[in-house]
């Protein structure tokens, strides 16, 4: 019976363990489905955030495009103004040259006329009168003919010069406009390129920081896993020792069962039973069998635990190896990125420096060419007007052609540099895309399900990613029927591991999504190997041409005795001075604007103070009129209301009117009495209407007084606001003055220190004095303009103040007239009321 009970108990325990195992398995599957649902939700949230981010980026891009369009329009207007100024200057110079040439021709003709007159006078003195007259007429005719011919020639030359000048001006405007448009486009593209490079640098730095943080995080995870592995190994060793001890005890028990008469068998009986008899053998045997079964169960449990720990140890070691492999892959991935980023930044800096050098050299060469042409034109004087016209036209055409060729070369060089930069950027983006695809393929691969042998059979569980150890360990661990603190600890560790793995996966997924979005924004098209080879060959040819041209220009400058470095330093100093002068002008304009605003605020403040003082004085002089407006009650006449307000309650106006009607219809009265009654009734109705009008005007005046009081309060509030704004403007003006002083000090230091000896050699003392005098004149001019503007603003404000005062006086006069009318109406109404009340009393 005992054996059947034990077997049934064992079967019941086994069924309970199986049920617990199935329940744990179902719980884990439910948790797995919850985690998958959460992952899908997170993916949807990430996609939503990406869409919002793309919308924000699109809005920012549209805003930037709008800003650039506004800037382009402003630049176009500025360029048009500069072009018109230059054309005006060229036109004035050409007109002056033409006037000088005309004066020279007129002087030549005057000299010729004087010579002819001298000849005529000589002939007149030497010969007879007929000869004199003939010669005089012939000379006059010849002079007229020559003058007419010269006049026609001069007119033709003038018309030709005007047409040529018009053509040259049109060509010059077209060329300058195209040049400025292309220069603005190149400048904008260059700035965009610089912004793109800075953005790529920042993104690379962020990516490197993120990778370093991930490496540190994974190192910490590896360290934690190694520590857990050591703990589990110690626990397994301790369990192994317990198993060996239990095996020894089991072997001793079995030997005691085989040899019942041995002293080993007697020792436990003596120790356990004392002085027992020989008939107690069967209970002892039953106890030994129970102990043996218990030991076997414990041994089986310990062996299962050892197998689980060994499997967990193997899984942890595999996971550690995988993490180490990922760390190495991440290091190998971001090192080429760093190298490539450094190479690209160096290449970009070299290209920008080369572009600046080429621009400076082009400017200097064009300037030198212009100076040489001017010198050649000065040396080679024209023999006539036609030669002068032809030489000027040739010089202008040659200069324009040279300028067009130089600008075309500069545009070609800049476009090729931009193409190389775009090619490098596309190569970098292609490498990023390939690495991203490889990483996605690696992340898509999932590990196979882990099969673990347990005490009751085999348990198979599949994990979400590569972390199947915690789930399988939880399913196997449910073999232990009693729940111990070790079980709780292991469950907590497994939950923490799953949460940690889930967080890692979400972080990696978000990082991949960000990288994918950035790649989608940056990648603009596919690459072509032939195009790459062609662009490389073109770049090499352009570099060789540019080097040859630079060498030729340096040789030409060396022949002219110019030093390139000195020219560059001179140009840099000139640019610095121009920048400082522009800053000073900007600050002075800002100062003028602030002064103007401060003056406006002061004027408005004074106006409001004056208005408030006038209102206070008027309130102090004239006491406030207290209008007690009694609203009309429906069904009551104004006379009745006024009588009740005055305290006369005996008279009822409606009854009085009825009585007057009755008296008017009474036949006993005489005609005169009836006429008097009718007139009294009409006068009463008119008085009632008049009183109603008075009440309406009184209400309107009361509303107007309320409006004036509210306006007074508004003026006081505006005064407070203007006081605050005036203080703020004063502070801003002080700051602007300080900034102007600082800029002047900077300019003075730049002129004194940075130029050094070369500036001293360039500028003589006379030129310095001239410069100082010009600066002083400019300052005086600016101050005079500011004073004139302040005076004009003050005059305008005074006119506005006078107009406001006149308006206020008119309103006050109107209010006083209305007050007088109200008083007169009140007096008339009182007189009428007394008259009719007296007449009614006498009549009754």
From Swiss-Prot:
A GO MF term: microtubule binding
Renumbered residue ranges of the record's region Disordered: 250-290, 466-489
Modified residues (Phosphoserine): 384
Polar residues bias spans: 466-483
Coiled coil regions in record: 8-258, 289-421, 493-621, 683-834
Composition-biased stretches (Low complexity): 269-282
Keyword Coiled coil: yes
Domain of life assignment: Eukaryota
Protein localization: Golgi apparatus
A GO cellular-component term linked to this record: Golgi apparatus
Entry keywords, A to Z: Coiled coil, Golgi apparatus, Phosphoprotein
Comp. bias regions, Basic and acidic residues: 254-268
Pfam families xrefs: JAKMIP_CC3
Expression by tissue: Specifically expressed in the CNS and endocrine tissues. Also detected in other tissues including heart, testis and prostate.
Family designation: Belongs to the JAKMIP family.
Name of the featured protein: Janus kinase and microtubule-interacting protein 3
Species of the source: Homo sapiens (Human)
